[in-house]
Regions:
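Charged, compositionally biased, marginally structured helical/coil segments
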Residues: 1-56
Length: 56
C-alpha cells in the first residue's frame, strides 16, 4: 500500500511530466498503473491538493 507521500510524489509526476490537468484522468491512470496499491480517498486528496497548488 502506498503512503500519502508516495501518492503525492506520483501524482506530481503525472501533473508535471505527463501534463495531466484533471482529477478524473489522473485517478484513472493511477488505477490502471497501480491496481490495489492505494485507497481511493487518500489518492483523491493528493490529486486535489496538487492540482490546487498547480493552479495557485
Amino acid at each position: 500500500m502506498m503512503t500519502q507521500n508516495e501518492l503525492e510524489n506520483l501524482v506530481g509526476c503525472y501533473i508535471h511530466l505527463e501534463g495531466y490537468t484533471d482529477l478524473r484522468s489522473i485517478y484513472n491512470v493511477l488505477r490502471q498503473e497501480y491496481p490495489g496499491e492505494f485507497d481511493r480517498k487518500p489518492a483523491l486528496e493528493a490529486i486535489r491538493k496538487l492540482l490546487k497548488e498547480e493552479r495557485d
